[in-house]
Amino acid sequence: IDLTGLPPTADDVRAFVADPTDSRAKRAKLVDKLIGSKEYVEYWTNKWADLLQVNRKFLAVEGAAAFRAWIRKEVEANTPYDEFARKVLTAKGSTKDNPAAAYFKILRTPVDTMENTT
């Protein structure tokens, strides 16, 4: 559930339990499969969009869509969390050219940014 936001199917559980492979190797294989899934990308895109407060209130429809699309691209690319955070927190310029800069349109004051970031 943590990786895709969805419970495993009954068939997936049966296959996992029936697999005679070492438990650790079996889990690692499953994690790799889930991280490569479209469900993982969708879940974490939504999770990050929620955490970064992507909405139309400050960004309008196009800005929110562009920021969400940027987040999706980063999740699909499996960008490490520290790099993702750095891209958001150091984003500058036009939100059209650099959608990550939209974060600072949402959180307009340094206090708001600090409270949401820490």
Stretches with model-predicted labels:
Residues 1-118:
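Short, structured secondary-structure elements
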